[in-house]
């Protein structure tokens, strides 16, 4: 929006023409918005009694969280949208693709949270309907980017740590994109089980995608680093920084002991947005490395289900795996910080892969 005013109202603020400055302003704006509005949201969440529903079969330590409000993802989404609309060039179609996922998946998460709170049940929206709506939005997103934008019509798959790292997969790319969108949103959702556990890996991952969006818009740098050239992808860096700032602002209230949880409205929206950005940048496989914590959590749930159905035995004492460590007696803050450390290391490994060959 500021770009529009600067151009058509002849304000001549040259600083707005520089991506790094707009990205920094975007981060700071979303951060301070959350710091300001967070206490008000938390107050009204408590007044409306939007408390986290605790599973009866969950860790006993979680009963102390039953009076902690959820649905904090609402003010995460608000601050991201505010900064994005304020600082991004809104003629850039990539921005609207990600915003559509942010809002669409956030709405599904909101309905899920609302049903949990209303009916005092941890199930919320039925699983089949949840995946149905997530899938519908995912396929609409994929169709839109393939029909409307020739710059990302390529169906090449970029494989990290390979000398010849681009492989043509044709129509399989549609299914890969679908699994990235739906999978990432649910992976973040599964990870969001401890205070601050999910939001910090989201921040790290988003920082990595920010760098790649900057590299991808320069044909020489993208060729040198073996990343896909995506024209005008630098605007995504501003949106990414809005996510980082919003995440840091939310962590202010979500760090142990949490005053608010993001709920499904936040985790589905953030996970879906990260998946969408990775698809636009052709970094679907690198996303798996960057978001290794989310992958680990998801695999732990899948293995637990398979093992119990086939062997009638559990691999983990409880899934997702962060609950396993809780049951083993490891303190919650230790689990959280160690997962953050692993997430940071995975980010560094993923960045090394850009020029390893």
Swiss-Prot record:
EC number per UniProt: 2.7.8.13
Any GO BP: cell division
Keyword Cell inner membrane: yes
Molecular function GO labels: metal ion binding; phospho-N-acetylmuramoyl-pentapeptide-transferase activity; UDP-N-acetylmuramoyl-L-alanyl-D-glutamyl-meso-2,6-diaminopimelyl-D-alanyl-D-alanine:undecaprenyl-phosphate transferase activity
One GO cellular component, as annotated: plasma membrane
Compartments in which it is found: Cell inner membrane
Pathway: Cell wall biogenesis; peptidoglycan biosynthesis
InterPro entries according to UniProt: Glycosyl_transferase_4, PNAcMuramoyl-5peptid_Trfase, PNAcMuramoyl-5peptid_Trfase_CS
Cofactor(s) needed for function: Mg(2+)
Keywords: Cell cycle, Cell division, Cell inner membrane, Cell membrane, Cell shape, Cell wall biogenesis/degradation, Magnesium, Membrane, Metal-binding, Peptidoglycan synthesis, Transferase, Transmembrane, Transmembrane helix
EC category: transferase
Organism the protein comes from: Buchnera aphidicola subsp. Acyrthosiphon pisum (strain 5A)
Primary location recorded for the protein, binned into one broad class: membrane
Gene that produces this protein: mraY
Function comment: Catalyzes the initial step of the lipid cycle reactions in the biosynthesis of the cell wall peptidoglycan: transfers peptidoglycan precursor phospho-MurNAc-pentapeptide from UDP-MurNAc-pentapeptide onto the lipid carrier undecaprenyl phosphate, yielding undecaprenyl-pyrophosphoryl-MurNAc-pentapeptide, known as lipid I.
Signal peptide: none
Entry similarity comment: Belongs to the glycosyltransferase 4 family. MraY subfamily.
Pfam family, one: Glycos_transf_4
UniProt xrefs under HAMAP family: MraY (MF_00038)
Highest taxon listed in the record's lineage: Bacteria
Residues spanning the membrane: 23-43, 70-90, 91-111, 127-147, 171-191, 196-216, 236-256, 260-280, 286-306, 334-354
Reaction catalyzed: UDP-N-acetyl-alpha-D-muramoyl-L-alanyl-gamma-D-glutamyl-meso-2,6-diaminopimeloyl-D-alanyl-D-alanine + di-trans,octa-cis-undecaprenyl phosphate = di-trans,octa-cis-undecaprenyl diphospho-N-acetyl-alpha-D-muramoyl-L-alanyl-D-glutamyl-meso-2,6-diaminopimeloyl-D-alanyl-D-alanine + UMP
Membrane topology reported for the UniProt record: Multi-pass membrane protein
Designated name of the protein: Phospho-N-acetylmuramoyl-pentapeptide-transferase
Cystine crosslinks: none
């Amino acid at each position: 929006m500021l770009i529009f005013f600067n151009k058509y109202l002849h304000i001549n603020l040259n600083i707005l023409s520089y991506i790094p400055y707009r990205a920094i302003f975007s981060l700071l704006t979303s951060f301070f918005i959350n710091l300001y509005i967070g206490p008000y949201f938390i107050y009204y969440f408590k007044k409306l009694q939007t408390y986290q529903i605790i599973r009866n079969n969950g860790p006993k330590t979680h009963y102390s969280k039953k009076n902690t409000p959820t649905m904090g993802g609402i003010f995460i989404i608000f601050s991201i949208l505010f900064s994005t609309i304020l600082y991004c060039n809104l003629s850039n179609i990539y921005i609207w693709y990600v915003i559509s996922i942010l809002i669409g998946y956030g709405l599904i998460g909101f309905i899920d949270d609302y049903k949990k709170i209303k009916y005092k049940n941890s199930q919320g929206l039925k699983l089949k309907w949840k995946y149905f709506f997530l899938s519908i939005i995912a396929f609409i997103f994929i169709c839109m980017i393939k029909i409307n934008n020739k710059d990302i019509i390529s169906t090449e798959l970029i494989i990290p740590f390979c000398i010849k790292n681009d492989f043509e997969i044709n129509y399989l790319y549609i299914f890969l994109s679908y699994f990235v969108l739906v999978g990432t949103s649910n992976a973040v959702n599964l990870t969001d089980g401890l205070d601050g556990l999910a939001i910090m890996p989201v921040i790290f991952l988003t920082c990595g995608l920010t760098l790649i969006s900057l590299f991808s818009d320069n044909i020489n740098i993208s060729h040198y680093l073996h990343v896909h050239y995506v024209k005008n992808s630098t605007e995504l860096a501003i949106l990414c920084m809005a996510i980082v700032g919003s995440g840091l602002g939310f962590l202010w209230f979500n760090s142990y002991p949490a005053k608010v949880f993001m709920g499904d409205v936040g985790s589905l929206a953030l996970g879906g947005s990260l998946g969408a950005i990775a698809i636009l940048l052709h970094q679907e496989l690198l996303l798996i490395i960057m978001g290794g914590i989310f992958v680990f959590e998801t695999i732990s749930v899948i293995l637990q289900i398979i093992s119990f159905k086939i062997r009638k035995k559990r691999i983990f004492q409880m899934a997702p795996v962060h609950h396993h460590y809780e049951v083993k007696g490891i303190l919650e803050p230790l689990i959280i910080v160690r997962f953050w450390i692993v997430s940071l290391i995975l980010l560094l490994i993923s960045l090394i892969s850009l020029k390893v060959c």
